Structure formats: C-alpha cells, structure tokens
C-alpha cells in the first residue's frame, strides 16, 4: 500500500490496521521529493522522477548535482552457514546509510519572489512566447534571482509541457542587438582609439558600407562617442569599430566572455556563436559591434555586463554558494572567482559607466 499522506497519519493508520487482524495488507515506506515553493525557481532546481523505486534526476541542479545529493543505502555483509544464519565468528562488514549532501544557493528568496512576480506581469501585458530575467551581483558573479516563462510546478506532473523544462537562460541564444554597443565602445576607449568626446558623422541615419545600407532609428549628424551610446547609433558604433580594427574587436568580444560557456551548473549550456576571425566578411566589423551576426545566451550577456559594471574583472557566475555534508558537517565553499581587469586604461571603467548612465538620465 502506498500513502502520500502525512507521516504521523500514516503510522496511525498502519497501527490501526495491524491491530484489526486483517491479513494480506503490507506496508512499505517510500520517499518522494517535495518542492514546497512550487513554481518558484522551478527550472533552476529541476526535479526528479521515480523509476522502479529509484530516484532519477531529470533537469536543473537536481541533475547536475545528482551524485552529490543522492543518499546511500546501508549494507551489512556477513558469512553465513548452510542454514543462512550468520556465523558467530565470521567476518562482518557494515556500511551505514547516509543522506545526500545539501546545496545552499546564491539565490535571495525575497528578490526571487519579486522577480517572478514582475515576470508574470510582463507575460500578462505583452504575451510573449517566452521570457526570462536574471539579477546578479557584478562583483562576485552571484546569481541572486533568476526566472523564466513558461515554467511549471514540479509537484504536479500531469500535462507538464517538456518545453517548459528547458533552462532557456543557458540554452537559448539570440542576436544581442544594441546590448553589444557598450561592449564594443569600452574596448575602443580602452585601446585609446577614441575618447568620450571623439566625434563621428552619423550620416543622417543612412550609411553605405561594403555595398550594404546601415540605418539608424532616426537621422543624426555629428555625435560624440558618449552621444552615440546615449542615442544608440548603429552607424556611430560601426565607425568606432572600424577605428578599432577587426582583430581588436574580436579580442574585445572574447575578453567579455562571448563565444564561450559561463560554466554555471546547468546542462546543456550553449557557448553562443562568435565566428572565428578568419571567417569574418567585410560587413562583420560593422555588424558585430551592434549585436548583429553573433548570438549569445542570457547568461553570457549577464556575465559581460558584470564585467562592465565591476571595472573590467571577469567573474564566474555562481548559483551554488556551498555544499554541506549533514553527517560530518564538512562544508565545501564554491569560491568566488574574480580575475584581474581586462582594461589597460584605468579611466575606461568610469568613462563607460558615465555613458551608460546618460542613457537613462
């Protein structure tokens, strides 16, 4: 007999049936993973299934850390007689049962709840097919809140859509568009090829390069580099990249983490798409810095903006803060990895931050 009821209630029922004298009724304890927060952080946590009394991790942290979190069964080995009884002086070895390890995340639950609520509002108003949001500490790389839609309740498996399982923040890629402009401009300022006050002719919103037309959203003339960021000029950013040169632009994109995985404990994770330098065409240098012709995951974009925000220091994104063994009390801390700044010029950070602030002022 299986029971999903409260454990104390189950024990009372078991005792009552045993005293009644009924025959042919047997009891076996079984355990089921419970997710008390329901949809909260569902894609990241993942879930497990039961396969012939064996717990099988399916997605998320459950799958990545399956070996760590799986409990071990106890076992006793002994020598026995022909009758199957343990020999009094035979060898006996015992292995105690043990619980799985505990994972402590970098997530801050109040912020997580707010993020989930805001994402629900966005879905209600704009009705996109999918959406995701990530909050991170740029100095440590800690992911402090993350959510995506569609999502699911891991406690309710009926009619669950497998498309909702995917961790879109790690698997999805898209052309970043104007998100890339501050990255390219930061590289140009750091190389010293431009300053925030360097002026470029934005051609009244129409510019031909390599036989192809590049447009701005509205006509603009002479703009400083700061104004190019403020007004999100495609033409101005493309001209800045031409001053950098293809090799330096490629180095900048890769220094900010594009084209490689972030290493978060979620599988699968994409590396995005950044063509190797030898496969660039004539248009690449004017399109890549405005986020066209390359593709990145949400996590890669978050990591690159952590680098922008913290003074040029590449950081490893963290979802897990520490792993604890409940039996021994031993704690394995997942270290914060913060590399030396990629900037050569000490003024680069302040310059790019001031430009980005001007966009919202």
Task: Report the location of each language-model feature.
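Conserved, well-ordered alpha-helix/loop/beta-strand core segments that scaffold catalytic motifs
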Residues: 88-131
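Flexible, solvent-exposed loop/hinge segments and secondary-structure transition points
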Residues: 21, 52, 119-129, 135-137, ...
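Soluble periplasmic/extracytoplasmic beta-strand elements of cell-envelope proteins
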Residues: 1-2, 26, 43-47, 104-106, ...
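Envelope-exposed proteins and targeting segments
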Residues: 23, 38-43, 76, 99-103, ...
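Small/polar-residue-rich segments within soluble enzyme cores
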Residues: 1-99
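Serine endopeptidase catalytic core focused on the charge-relay Asp
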Residues: 13, 59, 108-122, 245, ...
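Beta-lactam-recognizing serine transpeptidase/beta-lactamase-like catalytic domain environment
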Residues: 81-94, 133-178, 183-361
């Amino acid at each position: 007999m299986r029971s999903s009821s409260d454990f104390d209630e189950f024990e009372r029922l078991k005792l009552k049936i045993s005293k009644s004298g009924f025959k042919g009724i047997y009891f076996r304890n079984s355990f089921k993973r419970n997710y008390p927060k329901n949809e909260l952080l569902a894609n990241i946590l993942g879930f497990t299934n039961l396969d012939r009394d064996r717990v099988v991790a399916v997605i998320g942290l459950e799958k990545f850390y399956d070996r760590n979190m799986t409990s071990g069964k106890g076992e006793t080995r002994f020598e026995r007689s022909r009758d199957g009884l343990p020999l009094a002086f035979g060898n006996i070895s015992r292995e105690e049962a043990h619980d799985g390890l505990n994972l402590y995340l970098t997530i801050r639950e109040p912020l997580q709840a707010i993020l989930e609520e805001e994402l629900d509002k966005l879905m209600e108003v704009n009705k996109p097919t999918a959406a995701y949001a990530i909050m991170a500490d740029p100095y440590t790389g800690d992911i402090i809140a993350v959510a995506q839609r569609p999502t699911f309740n891991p406690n309710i498996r009926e009619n669950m859509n497998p498309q909702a399982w995917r961790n879109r923040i790690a698997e999805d890629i898209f052309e970043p568009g104007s998100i890339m402009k501050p990255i390219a401009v930061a590289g140009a300022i750091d190389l010293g090829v431009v300053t925030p006050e360097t002026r470029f002719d934005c051609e009244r919103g129409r510019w031909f390069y390599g036989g192809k037309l590049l447009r701005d959203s509205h006509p603009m003339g002479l703009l400083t580099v700061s104004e190019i960021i403020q007004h999100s000029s495609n033409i101005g950013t493309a001209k800045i990249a031409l001053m950098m040169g293809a090799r330096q632009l490629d180095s900048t994109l890769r220094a900010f983490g594009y084209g490689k995985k972030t290493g978060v404990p979620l599988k699968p994770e994409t590396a995005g798409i950044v063509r190797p330098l030898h496969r660039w065409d004539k248009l690449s240098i004017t399109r890549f810095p405005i986020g066209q012709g390359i593709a990145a995951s949400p996590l890669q974009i978050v990591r690159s903006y952590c680098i922008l925000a913290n003074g040029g220091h590449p950081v490893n994104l963290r979802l897990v803060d520490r792993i604890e063994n409940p039996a021994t009390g031993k704690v394995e801390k997942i270290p914060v990895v913060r590399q030396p700044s990629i900037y050569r010029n000490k003024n680069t950070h302040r310059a790019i931050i001031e430009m980005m602030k001007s966009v919202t002022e």
